[in-house]
C-alpha cells in the first residue's frame, strides 16, 4: 500500500483510461494471467501499479508498458493518423483476478 501513498489519489484515478477488451488481450489474460489497460501517455509503471491496486483492490506483481504508434489513414486525398496509445500489461499475483464481464453492484 505504500505505492498508493506516494502518488495523489486524484492523479491515480486519471492514469487508467480503459481496459483493453480484444482477442489478443483475452489470450494474454488466459495464458499469462495479465490484464491489459489503455493508460495515459505520461503514466509511469509505479503509477500504473498503484492505480490498479487502488481501484480494483488487487495485488500487482509487475507492469510492462508498450507504446503503440497510430496507424496512418487516408480519406480521399487527405492523409491522417490515429492517435498514439500506451498500453499497460499488468501481471497480478497468484490468486488475484479482475473480472470486467460481471455486473456492477
UniProtKB/Swiss-Prot annotation:
Entry keywords, A to Z: Ribonucleoprotein, Ribosomal protein, RNA-binding, rRNA-binding
GO cellular component, as recorded: ribonucleoprotein complex; ribosome
Keyword RNA-binding recorded: yes
Gene Ontology molecular-function annotations: rRNA binding; structural constituent of ribosome
Keyword Methyltransferase in record: no
GO biological process, one term: translation
SUPFAM superfamilies the record matches: Ribosomal proteins S24e, L23 and L15e (SSF54189)
Domain of life: Bacteria
Protein family per UniProt: Belongs to the universal ribosomal protein uL23 family.
Function (record text): One of the early assembly proteins it binds 23S rRNA. One of the proteins that surrounds the polypeptide exit tunnel on the outside of the ribosome. Forms the main docking site for trigger factor binding to the ribosome.
Subunit structure: Part of the 50S ribosomal subunit. Contacts protein L29, and trigger factor when it is bound to the ribosome.
Protein name per its UniProtKB record: Large ribosomal subunit protein uL23
Lineage of producing organism: Bacteria, Pseudomonadati, Pseudomonadota, Betaproteobacteria, Burkholderiales
Gene that this polypeptide is encoded by: rplW
Amino acid at each position: 500500500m505504500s505505492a498508493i501513498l506516494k502518488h495523489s489519489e486524484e492523479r491515480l484515478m486519471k492514469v487508467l483510461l480503459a481496459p483493453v477488451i480484444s482477442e489478443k488481450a483475452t489470450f494474454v489474460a488466459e495464458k499469462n494471467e495479465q490484464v491489459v489497460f489503455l493508460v495515459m501517455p505520461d503514466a509511469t509503471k509505479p503509477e500504473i501499479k498503484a492505480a490498479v491496486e487502488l481501484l480494483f483492490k488487487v495485488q500487482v506483481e509487475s507492469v510492462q508498458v508498450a507504446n503503440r504508434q497510430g496507424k496512418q489513414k487516408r480519406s480521399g486525398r487527405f492523409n491522417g493518423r490515429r492517435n498514439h496509445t500506451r498500453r499497460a500489461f499488468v501481471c497480478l499475483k497468484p490468486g488475484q483476478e479482475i473480472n470486467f464481464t460481471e455486473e456492477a453492484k
